[in-house]
Regions:
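His/Asp/Glu-enriched, well-ordered alpha-helical/loop segment
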Residues: 1-73, 92
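Active-site microenvironment of metallo-dependent hydrolases
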Residues: 44-136
């Protein structure tokens, strides 16, 4: 595998496999642990956060102070600023995302998409998936 820090500018993504960025960061952390030098929980968290520097460096919208993720997490052990990355790598998952504000707009409210027809979107996605699979 080499060393994970050979590519410090590599960010995380889901590549269409799933939409869970927390899971992607955790996978990165565990896979990097197999490589020479490993990766700390803080380094895995910083990789996830690197997208903000990329967005700001390219003057793209998003990544500003008007974005917020609110987690609902009942920690079985004390949660501090120092051990937050460890909780992030070992305990958090998408179920903990309670609300998300993106560019000042509430887009997830109490774990559900806000301001959109979730059932309609899922039905449309299902229809398009059937069309795609028919072509494959």
């Amino acid at each position: 595998l080499g060393r994970y820090n050979d590519f410090p500018r590599v960010m995380l993504g889901t590549d269409g496999m799933h939409s869970d960025m927390i899971r992607s960061a955790q996978s990165s952390y565990f896979i990097a642990g197999l490589a020479e030098g490993g990766m700390s929980p803080l380094a895995a968290y910083q990789r996830l956060r690197a997208v903000h520097a990329h967005i700001q460096g390219h003057n793209a919208p998003g990544g500003g102070a008007n974005n917020l993720v609110i987690l609902n997490y009942d920690s079985p052990t004390p949660l501090t600023q120092d051990n937050f990355p460890g909780h992030f790598c070992y305990a958090f998952d998408a179920r903990n995302v309670e609300s998300v504000i993106s560019q000042g707009r509430l887009i997830v409210d109490h774990g559900r998409p806000a301001g959109m027809d979730e059932a309609g979107i899922l039905a449309y996605a299902n229809e398009q998936a059937r069309r795609l699979w028919a072509l494959l």
